[in-house]
Each structure stands twice: as C-alpha cells, then as structure tokens.
C-alpha cells in the first residue's frame, strides 16, 4: 500500500464558531479558498491537499477536487485507458449540502488490483472507507445502485498496479441542501425542506408556490344587487348601492316602513325608492293630490262640471240629459216619417229625410219620375216608386232607350275586319286581302295568273309568291337566269347560255362539260415500235426505245451508216445495233482484232459492256445513258407532268406532284369538287380547278347556297309593317291601318262616314276619332250623354236628362239649379219672445227661451213651476224668467254647483284640502296644526318611544290634554326595575308654545330628572328630538351620553339596533 496511507493520520478537531463570518479568520491553508456554509465553512483545496483546512499534503499523483452541487468524477484519460501506478485522490466538497448522492455510470477496472474506495469527511483515509469497487462491473452488468453519504464532504481514492489497465470509471453526483434557506415563502407561510425542493404552507387568504398570491375572494362575485366587492386578506367587503344593505347587499331596504303613502295609498317598495299606488281619485308621489275629474271638461253641450272624490257631476242645460249632458231629447222616438223616411232629430224638433221616390213633410207623397219624360227615341215611360221603366222602340236599348244596339258587339267581322255599327245593322271594313259581308273570303291574288315562264303561283293573304321553273327568277319569274354569269367554262372554253343550262365550246386540247379535262392524245397509241407516249396539252411526245427515232419512233436507226465493220466485213443493220459478217474469222464483232476494252468493266450502273475494235459499247439499263452509263436519264426532260405538276426525276422513271385540283400519274385529271354535291337548296355546282362554284337558285346565296337571302334586310315594309322573309321574296304583314305590297298606303277609315249624330270624323292611323257635337259621346257619337249620371241634383231633387243638359225637380224646401239651396224659412223671423229659429227642410223650429212655448214661442209659462233651483235655493219669477237665490256654499244659474272652497288652496305646508258645503277641512301633515295647517304642531306622542340609549317611554293622552306614561332607562330595564311615573304636559293647550316636558318622579322621591322636547315636524317618520335641560341624578341616557352635560337626544318608534352599553 502507499506509504502515505501507512502514516498515522491525525484527526484535527477544529472548533467552528457558528454564525456569520466563518471565513473571517482565514482558516484555509495552502492557497485554498474558503466558502461559507451553514454555521461552518469549506476549504476548496488545490490538488494534492486535503484536511479540514487543506493542511495535509497527500502526495497523490492524479485526481482533482470538485465543489459544485452537481457534477462527475472520471478516472484519468476516461474513457481511454487509465495509467499504471495511479494514486488518485478526488475530494467532493459542497457548501450547504446536507447529503450527497453518487451514481456509478460506468466501471471497468482490473479485478482485485485496481480499486476505488470512498469515504466522508475532510480527510481521505482508506482505513475509514465506507466502501470500495473493482472489476468489470459494466461488462458484467453488476453496477451497484446509487448511494448517499450524509454531510457536505466526501472523498474517493483510485489506486492501480503496474500491469493491466482498463477504461476506468465515471461517477456522477448530486447534493441536497436546505432548500428553505433562504426562505422563499411569503406572507408568513411556513417552509418545509424537501429533497432538492421545498413546500410552503400558506396562511388563510394566500396561495401560489411561494404563497405570493393573495386569493381574490371577490372572484366569485359574492356581492349581490350591484354591490361593489373590495377584496381583503382572507375576506372581502361589499359596498352596497343605495337601497340595499347586508354583508353581501342581499337585503333590499324597505322604504315603505315609514308608511309614506297618504289617503289610503298602497306603498310598493322598490330599490332605493318606493312607489305609491293611489286609491281612485288621488294622485301625486304620495297620493296627496285629489284628482280634478273636471279638468278634462267632460260635460258636453254647456253642462257645468262639479268635481268630487273620484268622480264629478254634470249640471245640464235645458234640452240635454245624460251623465255628461251628451243626450239630446229625441223627438224622433214617435217615428213620424213614413215610407222609409229617415228622421233627423233637432233640438225640440225633427226633420224627415225621405227615401228616394217620396216627398212631403212626413214623406207621404210618391214622386212621379215620368213627369220629366226621360225616355228617348220614342220609348214609353212607366212610373214606379223612386224610378221608372222605359219601354224602348225596336233597335234601341238602355235605361232611357238612349243606346243604339251595337251589332258589332259579337263581333261579326272576320280576319281582322273592322266593324262599323249602324242603326239595326253593321258594315265590315275588311283588312287588305279579304272581302265578303263579314270579310270571310281570302282574295285569290293568283287568279290573274301573274307568274311567268311556267312558274307556280302560291296564293297568300293580300299577296302571292311565284315558285319559278328551273332557270328562271324574279318576283314574277320573268328573268332567265344567266348560267354563264359564273363563267363555268374552264381552260379558255366559250360559254353559251341556255334555259336552265349552258354549253361550253372548248379550246383545242380540252374537253368535258366545263372543258375541265385535258384531251388524252395518247389514247390512240400513236407511238410505234414500243415507244412510250406522254400526253400533253393538245399534243403528245413519244419516247423511243433504243434503236428507233422519229416523231412516232417509226424509223429504225441504221447503225451500219457509220461503217463499223472493218477489214472488209459486211455490216448487217439490226434494231439498236448491227452485225458484221467478216471476211475472215475474227474474235470481235467489228471484224478487227483488238484488245478487250470491256476487261476494265467500264460500264457503270449495271450497263452491259460490248467490246469493239479499239473501244467498247455499253448497253445501259433503262434509265441510264452515256458512254459508260454514268448519266441518269432525265425522264422529266420531256415535261411529262401536266397542269403545272412538278416532275421529280428518278431512275428510269419520274413522279409528278400535282397542283391542288389535279390528280393522275401525269396530273392530267382535274379533281371534280362537285362530286360531293356541295351546293345546297337547288344550287348548281360548277367545277373549278381546286374549287367549285355554286350558282344558287333564286332566293339563296353564300358559297354553298346555304343562306336564304333575307329580302327583309332592306326593310321594305313601311309604316310599321312586319316583314316575313320567303324564298326569293317577302310578304309584309301591315300594321293595322295600312295596306299595299309594302304597307305604303294608309287606309281611310273615315271613308264609310262612321260618326253619328253630326259627329266630325278625324282620320287616324288604323282608326278614326269622332269629334261629337255637344251632348253626345261614344266611339261614333252614338250615345246621348246622360248629364244626370253624376247625380247633380242635391237634396233629393229628381234629374231629367236633356240633350247637352238636365233639369232638376226639387223636393219642397229646396231651390236652385241643382236644388242645392235650402229655403230659409227663418228669413221672416217667425219666432217670438226671443225664440231662436232653427231652419229645417221645408219648415222651421223655434227654440223658445225658458218659460215660453208654442210653435212661435207665443205662450208665456211659470218659470219656477219646474222647480229649477237646486240644493235648497229659492226660485223667484222675474218676468218670463226666474232667478235662483242660492244658500251659502252653492252657485250657478240653478245653484247646482257646490262651490269648491279648496280651489284657492287654503291648506298650507302640504296639507290636504277636503271640500265641504260652504267650507273646507285641512288634513294637515304630521308636525303641522291649525285651520289651514299654518302652525308648527306637535308629533302624535301616543305610543312607545326609544331613544339612542334604548331608554323607553310609553305615553298616553288624558282628557286634560296631559300625557302620562312609563319611563325606564336602559339600565333600569336591564336590571328589571319598576317603571317610575312619567308626566308629560304641554305648556299650552292652544299650542302657542310648541314644546313639551318630561318629569320623572322616582318612587323613592329622592330626586328628579327633567328635560323639554321640541317637535321637528317628525321628519315624516315620527322622529322626536329632545334637549336635556337639567340633570339632578346620573341615570339618564348613559350619563347624558357619558358627558354629564346638556345635550340632544333622538327618539324613534323602534328600539335602536346599536346603542351604548352600560358600564360594568
């Protein structure tokens, strides 16, 4: 073992002074740093030292010291191999730690040789080791569980031998100190230390991890009825809105407790208010006002209103009755009017308004409606009740036989004909194209055979349409169509027009209907000896086979003409060659002996070589030429492609690429674009080169004749006529009032003189207007205007119609052209003695003054006989009138009015005035007295009262105006004493000094206590205020509220809820 471990280790006992400044004495040695702890210190030693004060040299050659609360210690070079002969010391010193927990993360050392030991305390000594580790713990999966040492210091010693090494170890650590230092708990909370944590126990009213949150007791909104919540610590206070109280403003203060409503009004408590429901007849906030039911002037027809409690009485003038004088006496109750007449009640009279057909004062007379001869045109009048009936002559109708029967009403005219009514008949004015009595016949416009050149005529309404034979056109098919106009003949052909056709005279070399075909001159095979014939325009070209020549290849070429045979050989001509018959046998065809020039194969492109003397001859394959067959024969040289076709030369042939509109090997065939029949609607197709042309039938146009020419496009129809397009034509449907092919002629509707009874006809488009003479109306002035139709005669007058006028026959009592004036029978002043004349229909009524009667008020009466004076008044006749002498308290013509003595508002200080007969009574408010409530009075002292100290007095009136009662102080009541005698008296029965006094007489007669009180109107709530004037013994209101001085006291009808308590 290491020598330094064999040394005797001396434990140093260091006395540590607890408190602040443990490091003040600088106890740490060898350059170590002092760190304050809890009542102690820790020296952070440099490597190689340990001990409480780092005063021991360890001699270790590796290791280190750690002072953080959490960390790790590794073997040297970890995770690489550690060193042999390692003596490592690790010190773990953590300030304020109470325990340190170690966890072995990795451990691989030589078994039994390389060992880690650990212990606690400031000095490392293997003899004091708590445990040790060695071996391949990680590999063997036997790493020990984490272990904890108590205290703030621990050490590890790692020693190795001199041979096998390994990767070593890694040990992590964490410490747990006093987490309540410093104490983070707020607001007086208690801190509980946990493992690496703490917990705060909050006092009531606080929450949060550190009890830093004041619980808002207002969050639950506890205050009711709009109260404002003020949060406190572990509680809250509610500030109530006016009208509520209670801890949570849950109580609605009863403002009705003081009985504020007067005159029997019912108090309804509200929030911070009350509302009085008044008895009928009263109003005001407190029902203090008697409603004046006369304010709305309910009495009608001059009646006088007398106000009462919740009602009124109407004093009616003569001639009217009813609660409100609303009823006029009904003179019509006897039903005087006859024959359905309506009775109109007047004041003391009536008037009959007769039913139609009746007249007279009582409607007894039947009016003769035939008197005015109302029936016209010979009609016979038959009188009835309120009417008549006209028996008309034949041909007339209507109430007055004024209407000529309209035979056009059916209507009889057909096909748009206009019917003109006559007397017992009619005339039809037919629309263009129709005739007949009722316009029932369609006029046949084809009857005159207007269509020419064999065309078919199709009759229409007011017109016709010609369907032309082939080759003709025009409205009447009068025009021969020029089929040459479209120039159908091609290639210079001359066109000759025919009926519905044409003939083309073709130029040389062309043929066909339109000279569209190039004539094939090769068709007769003119070329001889196997030559090829190539057709051209108006000709051909022969391409000869070898050995022939000539226009038709009719000549065999004489190849012997050049004397090819030598050495006396005889030349025999052949087709495209020759044969030499030699004088002597030779090896060549030309009888010479020569080298074989064919040996070098001079003939190209498959040509066959024939050796000749001093040369060779190549027989070329078709399509090649030249000495050596090196030239591709140009088959296009003869221009074989016709009609502009493009010739492309090939070997022994060619290809023609034709221009549009041509086809065939030599482009000699023109394509017939008409083969698909592109022309529509009978159009004739003319083939063109690469196109066609349509010669359209009359009435059609466009490239393929697909469009029907709109002959309406030029708007030929005049005056609003509607154009209907047809094939090669149109038809105008004229607007009413016009006629003609193009609607150019306006129809004269006045020609038939339709206007009757002298009316002037004014011609218009499709009609006419009759300007009638005065007195007539209607479309043709056929109707005599009934000037009576507007009922111009008023007031029951009978109207008789005349020509351009009328006559009114008035009922009795009316006059004027329209019976509009009621004859004024009062104009002669028939009523006597001041009577008022009321004009009626055909009569009058006199409204007599009192005490007169008769038709003309000529009869004098006893005015007092009807006892008009009311309420005990005396009636005095004065001429024909009377005067009522009223008793006091009444007024009016008949003393019917109870004088309202309250009208002058005599009651003062809010007193309620109650009207009486010839007088009034004031119902004073509490605190006021006197006839008019003009004096300040006393409260009604009877009953039980409590003052602010809960002293009690019970007061009772006596017949002398004095008051007697029992008085007890709060102390006396609390101790159960008997009540002393109390005498309460007014200073004057006349209320000239509104004060009162209490005299308390004790049973033992020892002494008295007395005071005087002043009534302060009771404030509407019966509240008394008393002033103490002398105190002979200390037994009143808590020693005069603890002052022994003169003072004021407040008395109410209820015991005080809060009062000063007596001293113990």
Swiss-Prot record:
Cystine pairs: 23-34, 28-43, 45-54, 62-88, 180-191, 185-200, 202-211, 218-229, 223-238, 240-249, 256-267, 261-276, 278-287, 294-305, 299-314, 316-325, 332-343, 337-352, 354-363, 370-381, 375-390, 392-401, 408-419, 413-428, 430-439, 446-457, 451-466, 468-477, 484-495, 489-504, 506-515, 522-533, 527-542, 544-553, 560-571, 565-580, 582-591, 598-609, 603-618, 620-629, 636-647, 641-656, 658-667, 674-685, 679-694, 696-705, 712-723, 717-732, 734-743, 750-761, 755-770, 772-781, 788-799, 793-808, 810-819, 826-837, 831-846, 848-857, 864-875, 869-884, 886-895, 902-913, 907-922, 924-933, 939-1015
Residues glycosylated per entry: 30, 136, 851
Cleavable signal peptide: 1-19
GO MF terms, alphabetically ordered: biotin binding; calcium ion binding
Pfam family membership, one: hEGF
Keywords in alphabetical order: Calcium, Cytoplasmic vesicle, Disulfide bond, EGF-like domain, Extracellular matrix, Glycoprotein, Repeat, Secreted, Signal
UniProt cross-references to SUPFAM superfamilies, sorted A to Z: Avidin/streptavidin, EGF/Laminin, Growth factor receptor domain, Spermadhesin, CUB domain
All copies of domain Avidin-like, residue ranges: 937-1056
GO cellular component, one term: apical lamina of hyaline layer
CDD domains reported for this sequence: CUB, EGF_CA
Subcellular location: Secreted, Extracellular space; Cytoplasmic vesicle; Secreted, Extracellular space, Extracellular matrix, Hyaline layer; Secreted, Extracellular space, Extracellular matrix, Apical lamina
Domain spans labelled EGF-like: 20-55, 176-212, 214-250, 252-288, 290-326, 328-364, 366-402, 404-440, 442-478, 480-516, 518-554, 556-592, 594-630, 632-668, 670-706, 708-744, 746-782, 784-820, 822-858, 860-896, 898-934
Stretches assigned to the CUB domain: 62-175
Principal location: secreted
Keyword Phosphoprotein: no
The keyword Transport is assigned to this record: no
Subunit structure, as described in the record: Homotetramer.
Described function: Forms the apical lamina, a component of the extracellular matrix.
Name the UniProt record assigns to this protein: Fibropellin-1
């Amino acid at each position: 073992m290491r020598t330094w471990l064999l040394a005797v280790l001396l434990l140093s006992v260091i006395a540590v002074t607890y408190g602040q400044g443990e490091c003040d004495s600088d106890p740490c040695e060898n350059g170590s740093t002092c760190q304050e702890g809890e009542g102690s210190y820790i020296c952070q030693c440099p490597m190689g030292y340990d001990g409480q004060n780092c005063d021991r040299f360890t001699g270790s050659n590796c290791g280190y010291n750690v002072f953080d609360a959490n960390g790790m210690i590794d073997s040297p070079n970890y995770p690489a191999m550690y060193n042999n002969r390692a003596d490592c010391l690790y010190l773990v010193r953590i300030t304020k730690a109470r325990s340190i927990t170690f966890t072995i993360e990795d451990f691989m050392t030589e078994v039994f040789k390389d060992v880690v030991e650990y212990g606690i305390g400031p000095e490392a000594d293997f003899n004091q080791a708590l445990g040790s580790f060695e071996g391949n713990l990680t590999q063997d999966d036997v790493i020990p569980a984490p272990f904890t040492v108590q205290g703030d210091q621990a050490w590890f010693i790692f020693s190795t031998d001199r041979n096998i090494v390994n990767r070593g170890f890694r040990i992590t650590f964490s410490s747990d100190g006093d987490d309540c230092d410093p104490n983070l708990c707020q607001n007086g909370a208690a801190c509980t230390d946990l493992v690496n944590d703490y917990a705060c126990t909050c006092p009531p009213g606080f929450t949060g991890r550190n009890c830093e949150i004041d619980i808002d007791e207002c969050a639950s909104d506890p205050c009711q009825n709009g109260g404002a919540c003020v949060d406190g610590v572990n509680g809250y206070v509610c500030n109530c809105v006016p009208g509520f109280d209670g801890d949570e403003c849950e109580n609605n203060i009863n403002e009705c407790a003081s009985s504020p409503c007067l005159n029997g009004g019912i108090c309804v408590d509200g929030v911070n208010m009350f509302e009085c429901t008044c008895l009928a007849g009263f109003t005001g906030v407190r029902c203090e006002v008697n409603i004046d039911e006369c304010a709305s002037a309910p009495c009608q027809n001059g009646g006088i209103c007398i106000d009462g409690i919740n009602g009124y009485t109407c004093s009616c003038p003569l001639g009217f009755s009813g609660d409100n004088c609303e009823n006029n006496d009904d003179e019509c109750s006897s039903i005087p009017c006859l024959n359905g007449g309506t009775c109109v009640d007047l004041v003391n009279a009536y008037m009959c308004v007769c039913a139609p057909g009746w007249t007279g004062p009582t409607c007894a007379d039947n009016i003769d409606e035939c008197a005015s001869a109302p029936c016209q045109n010979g009609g016979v009048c038959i009188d009835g009740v309120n009417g008549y009936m006209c028996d008309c002559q034949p041909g007339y109708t209507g109430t007055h036989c004024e209407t000529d029967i309209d035979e056009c009403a059916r209507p009889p005219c057909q096909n748009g004909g206009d019917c003109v009514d006559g007397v017992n008949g009619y005339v039809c004015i037919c629309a263009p194209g129709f005739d007949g009595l009722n316009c029932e016949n369609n006029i046949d416009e084809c009857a005159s055979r207007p269509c020419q050149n064999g065309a078919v005529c199709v009759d229409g309404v007011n017109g016709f349409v010609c369907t032309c034979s082939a080759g003709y056109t025009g409205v009447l098919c009068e025009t021969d169509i020029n089929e040459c106009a479209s120039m159908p003949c091609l290639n210079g052909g001359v066109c000759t027009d025919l009926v519905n056709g044409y003939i083309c005279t073709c130029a040389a070399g062309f043929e066909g209907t339109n000279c569209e075909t190039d004539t094939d001159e090769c068709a007769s095979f003119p070329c001889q000896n196997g030559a090829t014939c190539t057709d051209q325009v108006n000709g051909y070209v022969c391409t000869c086979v070898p050995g022939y020549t000539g226009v038709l290849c009719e000549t065999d070429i004489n190849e012997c003409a050049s004397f090819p045979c030598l050495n006396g050989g005889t030349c025999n001509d052949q087709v495209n060659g020759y044969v030499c018959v030699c004088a002597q046998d030779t090896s060549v065809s030309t009888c010479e002996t020569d080298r074989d020039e064919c040996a070098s194969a001079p003939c190209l492109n498959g040509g066959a070589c024939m050796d000749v003397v001093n040369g060779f001859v190549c027989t070329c394959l078709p399509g090649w030429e030249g000495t050596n067959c090196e030239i591709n024969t140009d088959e296009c040289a003869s221009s074989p492609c016709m009609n502009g076709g493009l010739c492309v030369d090939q070997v022994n042939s060619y290809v023609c690429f034709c221009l549009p509109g041509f086809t065939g090997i030599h482009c000699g065939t023109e394509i017939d674009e008409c083969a698909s029949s592109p022309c529509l609607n009978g159009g004739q197709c003319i083939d063109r080169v690469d196109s066609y042309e349509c010669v359209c039938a009359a009435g059609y146009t466009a490239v393929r004749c697909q469009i029907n020419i709109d002959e309406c496009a030029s708007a030929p129809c005049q005056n609003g006529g509607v154009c209907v397009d047809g094939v090669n034509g149109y038809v105008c449907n004229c607007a009413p009032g016009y006629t003609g092919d193009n609607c150019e002629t306006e129809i004269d509707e006045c020609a038939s003189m339709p206007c009757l009874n002298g009316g002037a006809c004014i011609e218009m488009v499709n009609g006419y207007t009759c300007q009638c003479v005065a007195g007539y109306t209607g479309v043709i002035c056929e109707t005599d205007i009934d000037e009576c139709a507007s009922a111009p005669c008023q007031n029951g007058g009978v109207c008789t119609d005349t020509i351009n006028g009328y006559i009114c026959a008035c009922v009795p009592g009316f006059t004027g052209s329209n019976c509009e004036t009621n004859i004024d029978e009062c104009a002669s002043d028939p009523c006597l003695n001041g009577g008022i004349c009321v004009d009626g229909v055909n009569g009058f009524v006199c409204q007599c003054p009192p005490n007169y009667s008769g038709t003309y008020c000529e009869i004098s009466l006893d005015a007092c006989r009807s006892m008009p004076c009311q309420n005990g008044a005396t009636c005095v006749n004065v001429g024909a009138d009377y005067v009522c002498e009223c008793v006091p308290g009444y007024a009016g013509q008949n003393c019917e009015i109870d004088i309202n003595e309250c009208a002058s508002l005599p009651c003062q200080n809010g007193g309620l005035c109650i009207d009486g007969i010839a007088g009034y009574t004031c119902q004073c408010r509490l605190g006021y007295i006197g006839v008019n409530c003009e004096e300040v009075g006393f409260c009604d002292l009877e009953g039980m009262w409590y003052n602010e100290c809960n002293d009690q007095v019970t007061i009772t009136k006596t017949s002398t105006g004095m008051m007697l009662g029992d008085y007890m102080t709060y102390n006396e009541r609390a101790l159960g004493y008997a009540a002393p005698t109390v005498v309460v008296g007014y200073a004057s029965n006349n209320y000239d000094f509104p004060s009162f006094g209490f005299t308390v007489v004790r049973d033992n007669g020892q002494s008295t206590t007395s005071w005087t009180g002043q009534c302060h109107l009771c404030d509407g709530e019966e509240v008394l205020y008393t002033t103490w004037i002398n105190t002979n013994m200390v037994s009143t209101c808590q020693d005069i509220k603890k002052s022994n001085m003169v003072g004021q006291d407040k008395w109410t009808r209820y015991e005080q809820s809060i009062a000063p308590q007596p001293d113990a």
